[in-house]
Amino acid sequence: MNLQQQLAYCQQHQQRLQLRHFDNETAWQLGEKIKRQAEKQGVALAIDITVNHQTLFSYAMAGTCAENQDWLRRKRNVVELLSTSSYAAGLMLQQRETSLDARYGVSLRDYAALGGAFPLQIKQAGIIGSVNVSGAPHLDDHNLLLQVLADFVGLPTGSIELLTPLTPLSA
């Protein structure tokens, strides 16, 4: 899958993975679902769900460390800045051959355009926050969120195309 294809999928994902409503109880349910999926996949994740700058769910699985919490913060900051997933932001920067600090003047100590943070978007209302994970390779973090969110919003299993490592454009 090349860069253009991945960007197109990221746009589709953000359109399809919208919620009807979201509250503190929803955050708890989503966070628990992410934890169960991580356990199934055998990965240890730090999980954070933030709405309007308030943390509604936070959990650090055994095997994570303080560094994972920092990655959560940096990825979440990208979602808040650009209103797109942290993975899609990284792809857009690659496409433009630039970086977060060069394009937006932000510190890379505070922002990370790597997979693992996804906007929480309410249908016909907009983005209210983000769901964030850290602990696996960043593409795996992103795909785990896609899987869980697809199930959470009631999409049929397999209806969301998971992303694969980038391949160069053929000549």
From Swiss-Prot:
Gene3D superfamilies: Haem-degrading domain (3.30.450.150). Coiled coil: none annotated. InterPro entries: PduO/GlcC-like (IPR005624), PduO/GlcC-like_sf (IPR038084), YBR137W-like (IPR010371). Pfam families: HbpS-like. Belongs to the UPF0303 family. PANTHER family: PTHR28255, UPF0303 PROTEIN YBR137W. This is UPF0303 protein YPO2534/y1653/YP_2345. It comes from Yersinia pestis. The lineage of its organism: Bacteria, Pseudomonadati, Pseudomonadota, Gammaproteobacteria, Enterobacterales.
